[in-house]
């Protein structure tokens, strides 16, 4: 059944497609991969599975309405309408990257290759596409909301972060910081500070805590061992390198 809301399918180039663009021919790409000691047929198989998943999802979406196919590199320049429905053919990184350009539009995250990708942010398979879309259209969907961090520099530039914000020199050399949160102030010196959201709390933040726990020989805080809520208003600050 056709409906008026536009369906935006977000995709990304496969590793094989990126290699073909970089080295111009499959032969050159194969030589490079095998020179690294990797199996080139893994790249070919992954590409075939992703392309097939994209065709299937696109077919399902076209049965329901107008579809706009959008590659990841175009995200920063695309203007989403308020009533657009976003469908991401993941990995997790593509979902996170897409979220920061949205303003409350529903996002359906699909895992194109469940046997290959660990989809923490990908609750749906390709076969779930129509059911998930129909639930959104009928407002019957189960929604998981997230909170993002907004960063503003002293020059007035602003950006949104879905997982983490890294504050520090590009060279990762040590620098001094004065951190002020409310009335609390702390002076420190490190190669950077990581500010994590709830969505990022099971990724980089968790690795940081595990490393700190190993160095200090102390167990992780129980409240943070499994991360914190995706929609939490809290932000956690971590020193990248003491």
Indicate where each model-derived feature is located:
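N-terminal glycine-rich "phosphate-gripper" loop used for MgATP/nucleotide binding
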Residues: 88-92
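Conserved binding/recognition cores within well-folded domains
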Residues: 199
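Short, acidic/turn-prone active-site loops that include or flank metal/cofactor-
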Residues: 93, 112-115
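Structural motif
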Residues: 84-85
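A short, basic/flexible loop-to-alpha-helix module at the beginning of a structural domain
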Residues: 72-80
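A short, gly/pro- and small-residue-rich
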Residues: 98-112
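Catalytic phosphate-donor-binding core of small-molecule kinases
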Residues: 2-7, 11-13, 18, 30, ...
């Amino acid at each position: 059944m056709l409906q008026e809301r536009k369906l935006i399918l977000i995709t990304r180039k496969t590793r094989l497609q990126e290699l073909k663009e970089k080295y111009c021919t499959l032969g050159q790409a194969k030589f490079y991969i095998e020179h690294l000691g990797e199996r080139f047929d893994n790249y070919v198989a992954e590409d075939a599975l992703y392309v097939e998943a994209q065709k299937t999802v696109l077919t399902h979406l076209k049965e329901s309405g107008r579809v706009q196919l959008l590659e990841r590199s175009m995200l920063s320049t695309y203007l989403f309408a308020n009533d657009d429905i976003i469908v991401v053919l993941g990995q997790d990184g593509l979902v996170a990257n897409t979220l920061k350009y949205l303003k409350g539009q529903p996002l359906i995250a699909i895992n194109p290759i469940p046997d290959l990708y660990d989809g923490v942010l990908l609750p749906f398979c390709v076969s779930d596409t129509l059911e998930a879309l129909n639930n959104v259209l009928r407002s019957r969907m189960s929604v998981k909301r997230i909170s993002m961090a907004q960063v503003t520099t002293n020059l007035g530039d602003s950006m949104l972060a879905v997982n983490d914000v890294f504050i520090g020199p590009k060279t990762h050399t040590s620098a001094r910081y004065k951190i002020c949160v409310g009335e609390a102030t702390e002076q420190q010196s490190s190669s950077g500070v990581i500010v994590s959201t709830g969505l990022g709390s099971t990724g980089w933040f968790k690795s940081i805590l595990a490393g700190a726990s190993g160095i200090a020989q102390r167990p992780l805080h129980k409240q943070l061992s499994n991360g914190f809520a995706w929609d939490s208003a809290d932000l956690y600050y971590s020193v990248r390198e003491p």
